[in-house]
Every structure is written in C-alpha cells, then in structure tokens.
Amino acid sequence: MDLIKHIDNSLEWGQLEVSKLTLDVMNIHGITSNKIRCFLNNICSIGGTYLEVGVFRGATFCSAIYGNEVHAIGLDNFASPNLMPMGVSQKL
C-alpha cells in the first residue's frame, strides 16, 4: 500500500467527516473535533499499532480503533480530570 496516498486520503476523508464511526463513538466526550476523530479512524484502517498517551475519556482512542484491526495501547495517569478544549473556560 502507498502510505503517502493513504495519509492523503485519510486527511481528505477526515475533513469531510467520513469514517466508520457510529454516533455512539462520536458522542464520547472529548477535547477534539469530529474531523480529527474521522482522520484517526481512517488512518488506522490499514492496521498496525496505535499508541495514545493521554487517553482522558477515550474519544480519540475509541475513534482510532473502532472497526479497525489494530493493536492499540492507551496510557493515562488521570491526573487532570478537568481538561477543557483550548479557548473554552470551565463553567462552575
């Protein structure tokens, strides 16, 4: 497989929010966009090994592995329970 072409296709499909992800996976709370979730799902579609350091609630981790035959490792110490996306203030 041409990896450069696969990366280009994964980026394109991610921008269009096209992937194998279901609404259940897309609804996992996280600090990322749907485009990134779709990109990760597409880039991992050829298998391999996926490592994520900082899993938080699993939004990107689950998006990457959903429907893909991939070996996956997720690491987190869960020391930051109140993470927020950049530019969003936490409401008390």
Predicted regions and their residues:
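Extracellular/lumenal glycan-associated surfaces
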Residues: 16
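S-adenosylmethionine/decaboxylated-SAM
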Residues: 4-6, 10, 23-29, 37-92
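Conserved P-loop NTPase mechanochemical-coupling segment
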Residues: 19
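Helix-loop module immediately N-terminal to the HCX5R catalytic loop
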Residues: 33
